[in-house]
Amino acid sequence: MERLTLPLGGAAAVDEYLEYRRIVGEDDGGKLFTPEEYEEYKRKVLPLRLQNRLFVSWRSPTGMDCKLVGPETLCFCTHRYKQHKTDLEAIPQQCPIDLPCQVTGCQCRAYLYVPLNGSQPIRCRCKHFADQHSAAPGFTCNTCSKCSGFHSCFTCACGQPAYAHDTVVETKQERLAQEKPVGQDIPYAAMGGLTGFSSLAEGYMRLDDSGIGVPSVEFLESPITAVDSPFLKAFQASSSSSPETLTDVGTSSQVSSLRRPEEDDMAFFERRYQERMKMEKAAKWKGKAPLPSATKPS
């Protein structure tokens, strides 16, 4: 692997370019703006972007946002969200709000999220993949003539089929009215529905109002059963130990369970294994120790 060496101040230049790319996105047409053009672009676009930001999500019938769309999220037309028209001078009055693709020759008229099955596109009922269909309205198959339009029975992690979901484009006010998170106002292009680090997770894993929500007190205080995670069962076993046992273990074992800075994965697990074997052997010999002899009466 070739090692890259940056000159003095090179790291700052890389950070400035990344900031430029996040703000400008695809609007420069592949040719960098001059400093004057860059400042003029920010003066003109950033106020509109902060005022008219659109939040895009893939929503289930239950109201949960199973997917929050970001700049790199693919559309049905196989182009990314950042390649669609996302900066509007005014919010359209009609619903739904269409965000057409800006790639030359693409027939996509509105951004439409389509999930993936692992790393592969999902299949239509005609047995062909989503990317084998036309991006024009109607979404007919390019491979067969019997397909009347893309329709997939793929099941989302929320338990609902893909065809029951909708790609929702909404304003900040509409999202606040539903008590869904909107995050902070940021100048970056095509942020879609991303409001924080948790937005990268799927809806059933997010514990905010856009996902499955905060667990109830009854759920958090429910007893741990055999169907729960092994980590929870191990925690229950350690927390239910008697105070005497915890005192006997002491702080040495707690320190021993921490990884040392110079240890890799194999060395850490090997050391923990040897310590466990040593403890088991000591406990075994302790159990075999002879009982103290009783004094016979004279």
Swiss-Prot record:
It comes from Homo sapiens. InterPro entries: Fam221a/b. The lineage of its organism: Eukaryota, Metazoa, Chordata, Craniata, Vertebrata. This is Protein FAM221A. Belongs to the FAM221 family. Residues 241-263 are annotated as: Disordered. Residues 241-257 have a biased composition (Polar residues). It comes from the Eukaryota.
